[in-house]
Amino acid sequence: ATSRKTRGGITSVVKAHEKGEQWNNYHCKWIETHIDKNGKYKLWYFIKGFVQFLWVLPSYDLVHIHTSEPPSALRKCLFVSFAKICRKKVIVHFHAFSPDTTVNSKYRWIYHYLFNRADRVIVLSEMWKEYVNNALQLNDKLQVIYNPCTTEILKEKHEKKNIILYAGTLNIRKGYADMIKAFALVAKTYPDWLIVFAGNGEIEQGRKLSEKLGINKQTEFLGWVNGYEKDKVFKEATIFCLPSYAEGFPMAVLDAWAYGLPVITTPVGGIPDIAKDGKNLLLFKPGDIKSLADQL
Protein backbone atom coordinates (compact mmCIF):
# COMPACT_ATOMS: atom_id res chain seq x y z
CA ALA A 1 0.00 0.00 0.00
CA THR A 2 1.00 3.65 0.09
CA SER A 3 3.32 5.18 2.68
CA ARG A 4 2.01 6.11 6.11
CA LYS A 5 2.99 9.68 5.20
CA THR A 6 0.98 9.72 1.97
CA ARG A 7 -2.17 11.82 2.01
CA GLY A 8 -5.41 10.13 1.07
CA GLY A 9 -8.02 7.49 1.68
CA ILE A 10 -5.94 4.34 1.21
CA THR A 11 -3.52 5.37 3.95
CA SER A 12 -6.46 6.19 6.24
CA VAL A 13 -8.02 2.79 5.58
CA VAL A 14 -4.85 0.81 6.30
CA LYS A 15 -4.19 2.86 9.44
CA ALA A 16 -7.71 2.03 10.60
CA HIS A 17 -7.04 -1.67 10.01
CA GLU A 18 -3.82 -1.36 12.04
CA LYS A 19 -5.97 -0.42 15.02
CA GLY A 20 -8.30 -3.38 14.51
CA GLU A 21 -8.25 -6.77 16.19
CA GLN A 22 -7.09 -8.56 13.04
CA TRP A 23 -3.75 -6.71 13.14
CA ASN A 24 -3.06 -8.07 16.60
CA ASN A 25 -4.52 -11.52 16.03
CA TYR A 26 -2.53 -12.20 12.86
CA HIS A 27 1.05 -11.63 11.76
CA CYS A 28 0.49 -8.50 9.63
CA LYS A 29 3.05 -6.27 7.94
CA TRP A 30 2.50 -3.01 6.03
CA ILE A 31 4.91 -2.69 3.11
CA GLU A 32 5.04 0.86 1.76
CA THR A 33 5.40 1.07 -2.04
CA HIS A 34 4.42 4.65 -2.89
CA ILE A 35 5.01 8.13 -1.46
CA ASP A 36 4.14 11.73 -2.42
CA LYS A 37 7.57 12.86 -3.62
CA ASN A 38 9.35 13.60 -6.90
CA GLY A 39 9.79 10.97 -9.64
CA LYS A 40 13.25 9.70 -8.67
CA TYR A 41 12.33 9.34 -5.01
CA LYS A 42 9.09 7.56 -5.95
CA LEU A 43 11.05 5.09 -8.07
CA TRP A 44 13.53 4.44 -5.25
CA TYR A 45 10.67 4.02 -2.78
CA PHE A 46 8.93 1.54 -5.07
CA ILE A 47 12.10 -0.52 -5.59
CA LYS A 48 12.79 -0.52 -1.84
CA GLY A 49 9.25 -1.67 -1.13
CA PHE A 50 9.39 -4.39 -3.77
CA VAL A 51 12.70 -5.76 -2.44
CA GLN A 52 11.24 -5.79 1.06
CA PHE A 53 8.17 -7.58 -0.29
CA LEU A 54 10.29 -10.30 -1.93
CA TRP A 55 12.32 -10.71 1.27
CA VAL A 56 9.34 -11.32 3.56
CA LEU A 57 7.01 -13.05 1.07
CA PRO A 58 8.01 -16.63 2.05
CA SER A 59 6.94 -15.93 5.65
CA TYR A 60 3.36 -14.95 4.79
CA ASP A 61 0.29 -16.86 3.59
CA LEU A 62 -1.79 -13.96 2.27
CA VAL A 63 -0.94 -10.81 0.30
CA HIS A 64 -3.44 -7.94 0.61
CA ILE A 65 -2.84 -5.34 -2.11
CA HIS A 66 -4.39 -1.87 -2.12
CA THR A 67 -4.71 -0.11 -5.47
CA SER A 68 -6.66 2.59 -7.28
CA GLU A 69 -5.79 4.49 -10.46
CA PRO A 70 -3.87 2.93 -13.43
CA PRO A 71 -0.29 3.82 -12.31
CA SER A 72 -0.97 2.18 -8.94
CA ALA A 73 -2.60 -0.85 -10.56
CA LEU A 74 0.29 -1.29 -12.98
CA ARG A 75 2.81 -1.29 -10.12
CA LYS A 76 0.75 -3.83 -8.20
CA CYS A 77 0.72 -6.25 -11.17
CA LEU A 78 4.35 -7.00 -10.32
CA PHE A 79 3.50 -7.85 -6.72
CA VAL A 80 0.59 -10.07 -7.71
CA SER A 81 2.70 -11.95 -10.25
CA PHE A 82 5.43 -12.82 -7.74
CA ALA A 83 2.88 -13.67 -5.05
CA LYS A 84 1.19 -16.18 -7.36
CA ILE A 85 4.55 -17.64 -8.45
CA CYS A 86 5.11 -18.34 -4.74
CA ARG A 87 1.59 -19.79 -4.52
CA LYS A 88 0.30 -17.22 -2.07
CA LYS A 89 -3.34 -16.21 -1.71
CA VAL A 90 -3.94 -12.67 -2.98
CA ILE A 91 -6.60 -10.08 -2.17
CA VAL A 92 -6.77 -6.94 -4.31
CA HIS A 93 -8.52 -4.04 -2.58
CA PHE A 94 -9.79 -1.53 -5.17
CA HIS A 95 -10.15 2.11 -4.06
CA ALA A 96 -10.73 4.01 -7.34
CA PHE A 97 -13.19 6.90 -7.63
CA SER A 98 -14.22 6.72 -11.31
CA PRO A 99 -14.79 3.77 -13.66
CA ASP A 100 -14.08 6.07 -16.60
CA THR A 101 -10.43 6.38 -15.56
CA THR A 102 -10.03 2.73 -14.53
CA VAL A 103 -12.05 -0.34 -15.55
CA ASN A 104 -13.89 1.43 -18.39
CA SER A 105 -10.82 3.22 -19.75
CA LYS A 106 -8.03 2.33 -22.18
CA TYR A 107 -6.20 0.94 -19.13
CA ARG A 108 -8.81 -1.75 -18.59
CA TRP A 109 -6.24 -4.42 -19.56
CA ILE A 110 -4.23 -3.60 -16.43
CA TYR A 111 -7.21 -4.31 -14.19
CA HIS A 112 -8.07 -7.43 -16.19
CA TYR A 113 -4.59 -8.81 -15.50
CA LEU A 114 -4.53 -7.72 -11.86
CA PHE A 115 -8.02 -8.83 -10.84
CA ASN A 116 -7.99 -12.15 -12.68
CA ARG A 117 -4.85 -13.22 -10.84
CA ALA A 118 -6.28 -12.34 -7.45
CA ASP A 119 -8.20 -14.84 -5.34
CA ARG A 120 -10.56 -12.12 -4.16
CA VAL A 121 -11.25 -8.55 -5.29
CA ILE A 122 -12.65 -6.14 -2.71
CA VAL A 123 -14.59 -3.06 -3.80
CA LEU A 124 -15.99 -0.29 -1.62
CA SER A 125 -19.68 -0.30 -2.58
CA GLU A 126 -22.44 -2.13 -4.43
CA MET A 127 -22.17 0.44 -7.21
CA TRP A 128 -18.48 -0.36 -7.67
CA LYS A 129 -19.24 -4.08 -7.62
CA GLU A 130 -21.59 -3.53 -10.55
CA TYR A 131 -19.07 -1.35 -12.42
CA VAL A 132 -16.26 -3.87 -12.08
CA ASN A 133 -18.38 -6.90 -12.83
CA ASN A 134 -19.88 -5.32 -15.95
CA ALA A 135 -16.40 -4.51 -17.21
CA LEU A 136 -14.51 -7.67 -16.24
CA GLN A 137 -17.09 -10.35 -15.33
CA LEU A 138 -15.47 -11.37 -12.04
CA ASN A 139 -18.75 -12.60 -10.51
CA ASP A 140 -18.19 -14.47 -7.20
CA LYS A 141 -14.62 -13.22 -6.93
CA LEU A 142 -15.96 -9.74 -6.11
CA GLN A 143 -16.87 -8.75 -2.56
CA VAL A 144 -18.05 -5.47 -1.04
CA ILE A 145 -16.33 -4.40 2.18
CA TYR A 146 -16.99 -0.89 3.42
CA ASN A 147 -14.21 1.29 4.77
CA PRO A 148 -13.70 1.18 8.55
CA CYS A 149 -13.59 4.04 11.02
CA THR A 150 -13.04 4.44 14.73
CA THR A 151 -15.97 4.91 17.10
CA GLU A 152 -13.90 5.97 20.10
CA ILE A 153 -14.22 9.68 19.28
CA LEU A 154 -18.01 9.58 19.66
CA LYS A 155 -17.58 9.04 23.39
CA GLU A 156 -16.01 12.48 23.78
CA LYS A 157 -17.73 15.87 24.06
CA HIS A 158 -16.42 18.78 22.02
CA GLU A 159 -16.87 22.55 22.21
CA LYS A 160 -18.25 23.58 18.83
CA LYS A 161 -17.74 26.69 16.70
CA ASN A 162 -19.77 28.03 13.78
CA ILE A 163 -17.70 26.14 11.22
CA ILE A 164 -18.70 24.25 8.09
CA LEU A 165 -15.80 21.91 7.37
CA TYR A 166 -14.50 20.50 4.10
CA ALA A 167 -11.73 17.90 4.37
CA GLY A 168 -9.95 16.55 1.31
CA THR A 169 -7.93 17.61 -1.71
CA LEU A 170 -9.14 20.85 -3.28
CA ASN A 171 -9.86 19.90 -6.89
CA ILE A 172 -12.68 19.86 -9.41
CA ARG A 173 -13.71 16.28 -8.61
CA LYS A 174 -14.21 17.08 -4.93
CA GLY A 175 -16.39 20.11 -5.73
CA TYR A 176 -14.72 22.55 -3.33
CA ALA A 177 -15.58 25.52 -5.61
CA ASP A 178 -19.27 24.57 -5.47
CA MET A 179 -19.10 24.80 -1.69
CA ILE A 180 -17.66 28.32 -1.90
CA LYS A 181 -20.34 29.40 -4.39
CA ALA A 182 -23.14 27.86 -2.32
CA PHE A 183 -21.97 29.44 0.93
CA ALA A 184 -21.76 32.82 -0.83
CA LEU A 185 -25.54 32.59 -1.36
CA VAL A 186 -26.21 32.33 2.38
CA ALA A 187 -23.18 34.01 3.95
CA LYS A 188 -24.91 37.35 4.64
CA THR A 189 -27.66 35.52 6.51
CA TYR A 190 -25.05 33.81 8.69
CA PRO A 191 -22.30 36.42 9.16
CA ASP A 192 -20.78 34.64 12.17
CA TRP A 193 -20.23 31.36 10.28
CA LEU A 194 -17.08 30.20 8.49
CA ILE A 195 -16.31 27.61 5.86
CA VAL A 196 -12.98 25.94 6.56
CA PHE A 197 -11.04 23.91 3.98
CA ALA A 198 -8.63 21.31 5.32
CA GLY A 199 -6.67 19.94 2.40
CA ASN A 200 -4.02 20.65 -0.20
CA GLY A 201 -4.58 21.34 -3.90
CA GLU A 202 -6.12 24.42 -5.51
CA ILE A 203 -5.83 26.64 -2.44
CA GLU A 204 -4.89 29.82 -4.30
CA GLN A 205 -7.78 29.37 -6.74
CA GLY A 206 -10.10 28.90 -3.77
CA ARG A 207 -8.88 32.09 -2.14
CA LYS A 208 -9.39 34.06 -5.36
CA LEU A 209 -12.92 32.68 -5.79
CA SER A 210 -13.93 33.48 -2.21
CA GLU A 211 -12.54 37.00 -2.60
CA LYS A 212 -14.39 37.45 -5.89
CA LEU A 213 -17.65 36.39 -4.22
CA GLY A 214 -17.04 38.66 -1.23
CA ILE A 215 -16.76 35.95 1.43
CA ASN A 216 -12.99 35.89 1.94
CA LYS A 217 -13.43 36.97 5.58
CA GLN A 218 -15.68 33.95 6.15
CA THR A 219 -13.37 31.48 4.43
CA GLU A 220 -10.24 29.77 5.77
CA PHE A 221 -7.77 27.49 3.99
CA LEU A 222 -5.69 25.40 6.39
CA GLY A 223 -3.79 23.26 3.90
CA TRP A 224 -3.33 19.57 4.66
CA VAL A 225 -3.91 18.68 8.30
CA ASN A 226 -3.32 15.49 10.26
CA GLY A 227 -2.71 14.37 13.80
CA TYR A 228 -3.53 17.03 16.38
CA GLU A 229 -4.51 19.65 13.78
CA LYS A 230 -7.00 17.31 12.10
CA ASP A 231 -8.45 16.29 15.45
CA LYS A 232 -8.83 19.93 16.49
CA VAL A 233 -10.62 21.10 13.34
CA PHE A 234 -13.04 18.16 13.34
CA LYS A 235 -13.84 18.74 17.01
CA GLU A 236 -14.48 22.45 16.46
CA ALA A 237 -16.65 22.04 13.35
CA THR A 238 -20.44 21.96 13.54
CA ILE A 239 -21.23 20.77 9.99
CA PHE A 240 -19.28 18.68 7.49
CA CYS A 241 -19.72 19.12 3.74
CA LEU A 242 -18.25 17.08 0.86
CA PRO A 243 -19.72 18.17 -2.52
CA SER A 244 -17.96 15.51 -4.62
CA TYR A 245 -18.68 14.56 -8.21
CA ALA A 246 -17.03 11.12 -7.87
CA GLU A 247 -15.82 8.98 -4.96
CA GLY A 248 -14.92 5.46 -3.99
CA PHE A 249 -16.06 5.37 -0.37
CA PRO A 250 -15.01 8.67 1.24
CA MET A 251 -13.17 8.25 4.52
CA ALA A 252 -13.83 11.92 5.26
CA VAL A 253 -17.56 11.23 5.66
CA LEU A 254 -16.82 8.38 8.07
CA ASP A 255 -14.43 10.64 9.98
CA ALA A 256 -17.13 13.30 10.23
CA TRP A 257 -19.63 10.81 11.62
CA ALA A 258 -17.02 9.54 14.08
CA TYR A 259 -16.76 13.11 15.39
CA GLY A 260 -20.54 13.36 15.60
CA LEU A 261 -20.91 15.87 12.75
CA PRO A 262 -24.00 16.15 10.55
CA VAL A 263 -22.98 15.53 6.94
CA ILE A 264 -24.01 17.19 3.67
CA THR A 265 -22.79 15.36 0.58
CA THR A 266 -23.68 13.93 -2.83
CA PRO A 267 -25.03 10.46 -3.76
CA VAL A 268 -21.85 9.26 -5.50
CA GLY A 269 -19.54 6.27 -5.04
CA GLY A 270 -20.32 4.22 -1.96
CA ILE A 271 -22.39 6.93 -0.28
CA PRO A 272 -25.78 5.62 -1.54
CA ASP A 273 -25.07 2.30 0.21
CA ILE A 274 -25.15 3.98 3.60
CA ALA A 275 -27.15 7.16 2.93
CA LYS A 276 -30.57 7.79 4.43
CA ASP A 277 -31.34 11.28 3.23
CA GLY A 278 -32.70 13.40 6.05
CA LYS A 279 -31.76 10.80 8.68
CA ASN A 280 -27.99 10.25 8.77
CA LEU A 281 -27.07 12.94 6.22
CA LEU A 282 -28.42 15.46 3.71
CA LEU A 283 -27.94 14.86 -0.01
CA PHE A 284 -27.90 17.05 -3.11
CA LYS A 285 -27.03 16.44 -6.75
CA PRO A 286 -23.39 17.11 -7.72
CA GLY A 287 -23.04 20.60 -9.14
CA ASP A 288 -26.43 21.81 -7.86
CA ILE A 289 -25.21 24.91 -6.05
CA LYS A 290 -28.68 26.20 -5.15
CA SER A 291 -29.60 22.86 -3.58
CA LEU A 292 -26.32 22.81 -1.63
CA ALA A 293 -27.04 26.33 -0.36
CA ASP A 294 -30.48 25.18 0.78
CA GLN A 295 -28.97 22.22 2.63
CA LEU A 296 -26.40 24.44 4.33
Predicted segments — roles?
Residues C149, K157-A187, I195-A198:
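Conserved donor-binding/catalytic core segment of Leloir-type glycosyltransferases
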Residues N116-L154:
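Donor nucleotide-sugar binding/catalytic pocket of nucleotide-sugar-dependent glycosyltransferases
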Residues D277-G278, L282-I289:
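Conserved acidic donor-binding segment of nucleotide-sugar-dependent glycosyltransferases
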